[in-house]
Amino acid sequence: MKQYKKFVAAAAFLMLLQSAHAQSDSTKTKPQFKLSVNYNTRLNYYGRTDSLRSSGVFPMAELWLTPKFYVNAAPIFVNNPLQSFDYAGTVATVGYQNVGTKWITSVYLTKPFYKESSELVQSALQAQSGVSLTYQNKIVNINAGGDVKFSDKVDYGTTAGLDHIVRIETKNKGVVVIDPSVYAYAGTQNFQRTYYKKNNSGFLLFPRNNQQVTEEVSRFNVLAYEATMPIIYAKGKVMLIATPSYIMPQNLITVPNRPDLSERGENMFYATLTAKYTF
């Protein structure tokens, strides 16, 4: 759910304002239930895509047990020339988020339940856990995070970013938050490398030959750069979010004559649209 986590700082800023208002006359906190509908114009995983230019719809249910602890679940429906609103699986998350005036800290554990027939680029992912830290100030917010991804192998990832939050109050007692941001993503990549090695066990009458060797390789590389600008409008219990983004995948894995083992990706614009209601 990378798209969801990108605007955590801006959404957390709004949560801080709403929480302060809601608790101004009471010290008790009640669980909050939230429902949202999200639409992604181009599903991707660090800029990696399928060959069908798929878009996705994922309704999300969130239960905030306290202002800091939450659980959520989001079924994912995929649209492309071959599929129309096809169910691909569900992603569930449990997490902790502490929003302060200077620091935002977050810890989460995500468990996907993808269909075996899912064509999503990230469908091999079995679980993911991560932490993030944001330092807020008036000039620029500094974001850093790390994660561990579990599939048939274990991969490690890091995120670094900068953003600047602009808050505008509207005449109808709403608020608009604009959060231009830039991010860099890095992580381990696992792939096979094939090369030829001289065979030194030849005899006098038989020439030495080359032996083909295939080995597993793991490298830590930059995965993508991204510029994004979440625009959030909130009034009362309603929140509307539009997040245009431009992502540039890096270090795509390519295997000669094996498109099934190669990564597909390109620099591209995409957007995530969200409508959320808090009960």
Spans of features found by a protein language model:
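Flexible, solvent-exposed coil segments and beta strand-coil junctions
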Residues: 38-41, 70-75, 108-112, 136-143, ...
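Residues on the lipid-exposed face of transmembrane beta-strands in outer-membrane beta-barrel proteins
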Residues: 37-39, 59-65, 92-96, 129-137, ...
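Short glycine/proline- and aromatic-enriched beta-strand/turn motifs that initiate or cap beta-hairpins
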Residues: 24-78
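Transmembrane beta-barrel strands of outer-membrane/channel proteins
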Residues: 35-41, 63, 73-75, 107-111, ...
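Solvent-exposed loop/turn segments connecting transmembrane beta-strands
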Residues: 46-55, 77-88, 113-125, 148-157, ...
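Bacterial Sec-dependent N-terminal signal peptides
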Residues: 1-26, 269-271, 275-279
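Short loop/turn motifs that connect adjacent beta-strands in outer-membrane beta-barrel proteins
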Residues: 24-31, 99-105, 139, 167-178, ...
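Outer-membrane beta-barrel transmembrane domain signature
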Residues: 149-266, 270, 277-279
